[in-house]
């Protein structure tokens, strides 16, 4: 069974409480459980991990090496600051999609730059929790293309 990893960065554990006018009222647990059920219904395994510290996220990315097929990541504020998370994602060579609940381009100027976007398969922002659903759909679509290619070549 193909495995997808959902990573969430700093302060996302506060979803549902933190600035609901920006981030919505769903909790991270609500999102994780919904995505896990959606993935399982389509024959995929979804693991999830949230950390407020950069080191923990980097270590989890490293643990994904050779046992994870796709990463969905909302790096939170590390989007705009972390070359280290970028380097970790490049080191493991696992395709990933970047997700943001809010439209980072409609917010403060310092949020407009991402250290991940140019190496991600795609970026979804501003669609609230629904963005995670779209990211999962994309991840599954990409994995199905890979599986189809493997079947045709082997």
Swiss-Prot record:
Pfam families: DHquinase_II
InterPro entries xref list: DHquinase_II (IPR001874), DHquinase_II_CS (IPR018509), DHquinase_II_sf (IPR036441)
Keywords for this protein: Amino-acid biosynthesis, Aromatic amino acid biosynthesis, Lyase
Known catalytic reactions: 3-dehydroquinate = 3-dehydroshikimate + H2O
Enzyme class at the top of the EC tree: lyase
EC identifiers of the protein: 4.2.1.10
Gene3D superfamilies: Dehydroquinase, class II (3.40.50.9100)
Organism superkingdom: Bacteria
Positions bearing the site annotation: Transition state stabilizer: 18
Binding site for substrate: 74, 80, 87, 101-102, 111
Pathway the protein contributes to: Metabolic intermediate biosynthesis; chorismate biosynthesis; chorismate from D-erythrose 4-phosphate and phosphoenolpyruvate: step 3/7
Transmembrane segments: none
Disulfide linkage: none
An example Gene Ontology biological process: amino acid biosynthetic process
HAMAP family assigned to the protein according to its UniProt record, in alphabetical order: AroQ
Subunit structure and binding partners: Homododecamer.
Function: Catalyzes a trans-dehydration via an enolate intermediate.
Family: Belongs to the type-II 3-dehydroquinase family.
Name of the molecule in the record: 3-dehydroquinate dehydratase
Source species of the chain: Actinobacillus pleuropneumoniae
């Amino acid at each position: 069974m193909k495995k997808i990893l959902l990573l969430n960065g700093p302060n996302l554990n506060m979803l549902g409480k933190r600035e609901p006018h920006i981030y919505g009222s769903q909790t991270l647990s609500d999102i994780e459980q919904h995505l896990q059920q959606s993935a399982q219904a389509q024959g995929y395994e979804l693991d999830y991990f949230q950390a407020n510290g950069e080191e923990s996220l980097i270590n989890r990315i490293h643990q994904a090496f050779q046992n994870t097929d796709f990463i969905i990541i909302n790096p939170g504020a590390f989007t705009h600051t972390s070359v280290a998370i970028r380097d970790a994602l490049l080191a493991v060579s696992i395709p990933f999609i970047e997700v943001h609940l809010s439209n980072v381009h409609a917010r403060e100027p310092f949020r407009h730059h991402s250290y991940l976007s140019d190496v991600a398969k795609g970026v979804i922002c501003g669609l609230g929790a629904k963005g995670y659903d779209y990211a999962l759909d994309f991840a599954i679509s990409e994995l199905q293309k890979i599986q189809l290619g493997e079947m045709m070549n082997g």
